[in-house]
Amino acid sequence: MLVDNGVIGDSRVQKAARSAADAGWDVVLLGRAPVGQPQSWRLGAAEVRLIPMAEPLSRRRHEFRRAWLRHPLAYPPSGVAAHRTQTVRAWRADLAVRRAALTTAARDAGAGRPGGLPWATLRAEEKLAGLTRRWVGFRNRQLTRARKGRKLDGPWDRAYTAFWRRLRGDGAWRRLEPGLWDYELAYGPVVDELAPDLIHANDFRMLGVGARAKIRAAARGRRIALVWDAHEYLPGVQPWRDNARWLPGNVAHEREYVPYADATTTVSGGLADLLREEHRLAERPAVVLNAPAVDEVPADPTGPVPDIRALCGLGPDAPLLVYSGVAAAKRGLGVLVEALPRLPGAHVALVVNKPTSAYVRGLVTRAEELDVADRLHVLPYVPHHQVVRFLAGAQVGVIPIQHWPNHEIALITKFFEYSHARLPLVVSDVRTMAETVRETGQGEVFRAEDVADFVRAVTAVLADPARYRAAYDRPGLLADWTWEAQARVLDDVYARLLPDAPPRPATPASAPAPTAVPASVEVGA
């Protein structure tokens, strides 16, 4: 099983690896080490290995060159700018201490103001340091302007992209997004050494790694079955890098290697239909929802579940809205903060992946400006087997995501986590989620980014939460929204691709398997 991240924080991948191992498959999950050293641990009966990966190809050649013509005084893009900036800061800090020491010595000696050669020398150095700081700052600004002019989004870059796409077709990714080779060079040799019977490639980057391993194995007379697990509709993704080549490069890479997949799985029916049409797949991808693992027993089942209300300093009756997941502008979290002045007495808990990120700090600052900072609570993730019980302490689950193509076509992880916590929902009007909430009656829908409509929806839910919670009593609703149900779909895909696999002595799913995992994992992306 292949994934392009550090595994921790990716609940879908963790659940897939663990449930496949519980079903009797011999699972090795390869991820990317966040530091330069390899790491390994057990995830239930699955083995996790994190591989160190260098990224020299993620930087383009122009990023190593100086802009001699446009910005001749800019620092070279070698990292020396940060070194010089820090050096000047250290120098000025030292001068401040020397000034304080001379001032104290003069006062203790009864001389009043300091003087003499040491003081004159210090004053001269301070002037020199000030001039140096301005010079370093100027060269830094020149470097920033040079980089801004090299973001690969100008007319020349669009022409370059069009040229290679016309010349090489889907093979153009080798020119447009060469950083994909960094993944191949790190993961490929490890996959070859493992000699798997089946590769489960998560998302678009790992599709190429898996396909190339399959091609090499076929040349040696071995068959590898390849499963592509598509988490997103790539043409609708907001580019992860700030250049015009990233998206067409990755789309071309995906198109080149999709034909090598023996089966495709994905996260929603809408995305399954899109993928079948986009890639002319012979069959509709199997749908494996991002549902929570409600029956999973942790390695330490006695570990206490944090109390979300206690962490917020709230009693049992205070209205508490919760958002759990990634903190980013396209997730629409600003609407929660803007609404707080219009929701007297209500509190908001943001359970996010990076509580101290610049985006989250901006939300806190805005809450302070609105004089509602005491009602905004920022909390870190909890282990994924505690998520549902943790969230159940809130009163309303909020999903305020904005209109992006991938948001329209799937029920995201937090939707299912809120549902199993039996929380009434307030969700934005992205298509699939809004249709589901209206059909089940488990919450209210508001217009994305519309603060007034959000306040209306929250007010309606808080007025009669029992009405919305009653939706979860529908027979079979929550049972279908579990990872245990989804794992059976995945197991059927594996079994179909490997019909000659020996009988699998399944590990009982209810039994905790030895697990040694670094501290915390995601609440839900």
Label the predicted regions.
Residues 27-178, 270-276, 285:
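N-terminal strand-loop element at the rim of the active site
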Residues 28-31, 49-52, 225-226, 235, ...:
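Donor nucleotide-sugar binding/catalytic pocket of nucleotide-sugar-dependent glycosyltransferases
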Residues 168, 173-177, 185-190, 208, ...:
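Membrane-proximal helix-turn-helix segments that form the acceptor-binding/catalytic region
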Residues 265, 303, 314-340, 349, ...:
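Conserved donor-binding/catalytic core segment of Leloir-type glycosyltransferases
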Residues 449, 463-496:
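A charged, aromatic-enriched C-terminal amphipathic alpha-helix characteristic of glycosyltransferases
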